[in-house]
Amino acid sequence: WIGNDANFALTNSYIPQAKLANQVLVSKIKALNEQAPNAKLNVTGHSLGTMVAAQAVAKLYHDDPKAFETIGEVVLFDGADVTQSLKNMGMTDKEIKAAGKKVTYYVNPFDLVSMLNRTTPYEEQFGTVHVIVPLNFNTTFETKNSSHDFGEF
C-alpha cells in the first residue's frame, strides 16, 4: 500500500501502473479496431485498480480521443477520486469531464480507499459517483467482512 496507494494519495501522482495500463489500452484498442471495428472495450477496477483504470482511460482520451471512442463502460469499485491527479497529468477540466462521462464509481463511505481525495461534491469529481453502504456498516480494517471487500455488499 505504501508504495502504490500512499504515493497517489499524498501527491496525486500519475502512478506507474496506470502508465503501463495506458500503453496496453493503446495496443489492445489498435488490435480490437482491426479485428472487430464495432466492438467496445469495457474496463473495471477495484481499489488500486480504480486509480490505474481511471488514469489510463483518461490519458487515452487526452492523447487520442478517437481511440477513446472504443472504450465502452468504465466501472470502478472502492477507489479514490483521481481528479487532481488528472489535472497534474496536464488534463483540462473539459477533458476530465469528457473522459469521465464513461466512468461510474461505486464508493463506500466507511471505506478509507473509497474516500481518498473525495473532498469536493460528488458531482465535481471524476465520473459518476454512486455511494453504496456495506451490509454490516463495517470499516476498511475489520478482519471479518471488511467494507473494502466485495462480499460485504
Language-model region placement:
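The feature captures the conserved acid-bearing segment of alpha/beta-hydrolase catalytic domains
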Residues: E69-F153
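A conserved cap/lid and substrate-binding interface adjacent to the catalytic center
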Residues: W1-T44, D64, F68-E73, Q84, ...
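Active-site signature of alpha/beta-hydrolase-fold catalytic machinery across serine-
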Residues: Q55-K59
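Hydrophobic alpha-helical segments
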Residues: L60-D63, T92
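Gly/Ala-rich beta-loop-alpha elbow adjacent to hydrolase catalytic centers
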Residues: T44-G49, A53
